Amino acid sequence: MLYYFFKYIDRFSHIPGIGVFKYISFRAASAAILSLCISIFLGKRLIIFFKTAQIKEGIRELDLAGQSEKAHIPTMGGIIIIAATVVPTLLFAKLKNVYIMLLLISIIWMGLIGFIDDYIKVFKRDKKGLAGKFKIVGQVALGVIVGITLIFRDDVVIREFGSNITVIENGQVTINDYKDVKTVKTTIPFLKNNELDYSKLIPWLDSKYMWIVYVLFMIFIIAAVSNGANLTDGLDGLTAGTSAIIGTTLAILAYVSGNVIFSRYLNIMYIPNLAELAIFCTAFVGACVGFLWYNTYPAQIFMGDTGSLAIGSVIAVLAIVIRKELMIPLLCGIFFIETLSVIIQVGYFKYTKYRYGIGKRMFKMAPLHHHFQKLGFHESKIVTRFWIVGIVLAILSLVTLKLR
């Protein structure tokens, strides 16, 4: 909103400093600072309100150290992250940008699904919360929206550079050094010729049906990352801190992929209008860091499914629109290993029960962070070490820009 306001003012006046709103770097920094302030300011007041209203989730007895102390801590803190991300984005971003619209839809939609889940747990006293099938329906709906938008919107393109490229637009023939291409290509990390075209994955499938395969893949990615973030949210500060690290990396990737100079220098896919996403990313990072102010050990508030489902969907959609979704197992390695530990635990238990009649466990408890708790590690040490691993994975993800 402020972008359009100051653009309008600048058209009729020459007030010094107004032109700075044209720069993405300034608006991204402003969004980060504002989101941090909003989350800290709003967090303090919501904690008081939630405690007064007894908005807290029942704690399952898992025989973990310090578990009983968390019974009185309010939940639904994801509202803080969502508000602190959405408000700065509305103020500083170009709201007509298709990528900004997709991310706003994603965080609000999955935040609403998570809110309903938390509401049922808190006010209906049902520890199961929203039935899993309804969460899946929400994730599928978001995947369909994202997939169809990226395929059928005319302004979602990549720009290919060359020399003397003939471009036909509106019946006019021009010679450029680039052309905008409507494609479903993505990036494969660590490979020299690192572009993968989804339309060539199934060569025997008619091209007019390729969008169905693409949408199904988008649904899988969004569901996987969203549930991964949800599983990771088991220790104070773990999901928020990890998400801030991932969000910072995605902000850098969005900016360089949407900047013609950096993209050509790094020889990566250039996506017009994508750099605007850096504003959403920095707002998201600021919101997560501000939430950590109250969520680090010992936590004063939990994000609940309101936060974890929204965070996971945002990270997934960001990776998809930046065309870095195949990097998710590396960049979101913490979410990935937490999810994998649950799959291994359940699968191994079922296998041993079927084979030997007695179910055995691979880990002392899943997800993986609870395994380390059972081994006697303090909660804050586990979280800090997971953050360190997350930082290393983020650096490796950025290294893929040049290492091929």
UniProtKB/Swiss-Prot annotation:
Pfam families: Glycos_transf_4. Its cofactor is Mg(2+). GO terms for cellular component: plasma membrane. Its EC number is 2.7.8.13. It is found in: Cell inner membrane. The keyword NAD does not apply. GO terms for molecular function: metal ion binding; phospho-N-acetylmuramoyl-pentapeptide-transferase activity; UDP-N-acetylmuramoyl-L-alanyl-D-glutamyl-meso-2,6-diaminopimelyl-D-alanyl-D-alanine:undecaprenyl-phosphate transferase activity. It is a multi-pass membrane protein. The chain crosses the membrane at residues 30-50, 73-93, 100-120, 132-152, 209-229, 242-262, 274-294, 301-321, 326-346, 381-401. It catalyses: UDP-N-acetyl-alpha-D-muramoyl-L-alanyl-gamma-D-glutamyl-meso-2,6-diaminopimeloyl-D-alanyl-D-alanine + di-trans,octa-cis-undecaprenyl phosphate = di-trans,octa-cis-undecaprenyl diphospho-N-acetyl-alpha-D-muramoyl-L-alanyl-D-glutamyl-meso-2,6-diaminopimeloyl-D-alanyl-D-alanine + UMP. GO terms for biological process: cell division; cell wall organization; peptidoglycan biosynthetic process; regulation of cell shape. This is Phospho-N-acetylmuramoyl-pentapeptide-transferase. It comes from Amoebophilus asiaticus (strain 5a2).
